[in-house]
Structure formats: structure tokens, C-alpha cells
A protein has these predicted regions:
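Domain-level signal for soluble alpha/beta catalytic cores
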Residues: 1-166
């Protein structure tokens, strides 16, 4: 039977907007997966909610996740974030979210004007990172975001079966 099976809300990075979006998604009655976007500060000492380079962050990532996680949902995690920023963000998510976790990071940088992606994380490196997210943070839902190509997914297919139940 055709139809919608779940709702995924992505780039939750602003407390006020995220609350509105998540409450609306939950009101539908379908499972809801919540994707937070995060980035490290320039000095790499703290995690911020993702923001455009020409605007300041509206909240710290810790504050965002703490405020939003109480709303519920069926899975939550980190997406549309740099690979190197994902583990620190998962560490914060782990403090406030005990449900199933997801993670899918950007593996490339956009080169304008033709929407080509320059690889910033090889397929092998990405698979290794995902394995660490599974082992260290209990991530159960994985994938790829900007720049992810067929080779990234092929290697995941080859390396992830060891994490599947019996």
C-alpha cells in the first residue's frame, strides 16, 4: 500500500523554529526522525548549532538539543554536518536523547557554480567514522549527505553487516 511511512525533519538548528516544526510533524501521528545540524567553533573548543557563515549562531548546540529532545520523536541524530563535527555533536546528543540515533554527514564541499562536490572524506574514511559512531554512540541509522557518492555507500554495504543482529 502506498503512503508516507515516516517524517524526517532536517537541519534543526534554531530552537524556536525547531519546536514549531517538530510539534507539527509529531501531530501527524507518523514516526518522526529529527536531524540536528552542528558545527564546531573556529577554535574547535565548542559545538554550535549550524549557522550560515555570514550570521551568528542563534544558540549553542547543547542548549538546542536540551530544549528540543523533550518534545519526543522516534529517532534523533546529526546530519548535514562535517564529518569531523559529527562525533562531538553526537556526544552532546547522547546526554539528552536515549532513543535510536542517526548520523549522516557531508563527505564533500560544494564547488559553485555547477553543484559539483570536492571530496573531503574518502569512502574508506567515512566508513571508519560511521563504525566509530556505531561503537561509541550507539548510532543505528546511517547514510550520507552532501557529497556522498555510490562508492561511499558501497563500502558501507560491505562493512556494516557485522553490526546487524544475528
Amino acid at each position: 500500500e502506498a503512503g508516507v511511512d515516516l517524517i524526517i525533519v532536517e537541519m534543526m538548528r534554531d530552537i524556536e523554529n525547531a519546536k514549531l516544526v517538530i510539534k507539527a510533524a509529531l501531530s501527524v501521528g507518523l514516526p518522526v526522525w529529527i536531524g540536528y545540524s552542528a558545527m564546531m567553533s573556529e577554535n574547535r573548543k565548542s559545538v554550535h548549532a549550524w549557522y550560515w557563515k555570514n550570521k551568528l549562531p542563534t544558540s549553542g548546540f547543547d542548549e538546542l538539543v536540551e530544549s528540543i529532545s523533550t518534545l519526543g520523536g522516534d529517532a534523533a541524530g546529526i546530519m548535514h554536518s562535517q564529518v569531523r563535527d559529527t562525533a562531538p555533536a553526537l556526544e552532546i546528543l547522547d546526554r539528552y536523547w536515549s532513543g535510536p540515533k542517526l548520523a549522516y554527514a557531508e563527505t564533500g564541499e560544494l564547488e559553485k557554480p555547477d553543484w559539483n562536490f570536492k571530496e573531503i572524506c574518502s569512502p574508506e574514511e567515512y566508513a571508519t567514522e560511521i563504525e566509530s559512531w556505531i561503537n561509541n554512540y550507539g548510532v543505528q541509522i546511517v547514510g550520507g549527505c552532501c557529497g556522498t557518492g555510490p562508492e561511499h555507500i558501497r563500502i558501507l554495504k560491505d562493512r556494516l553487516p557485522r553490526y546487524l543482529p544475528g
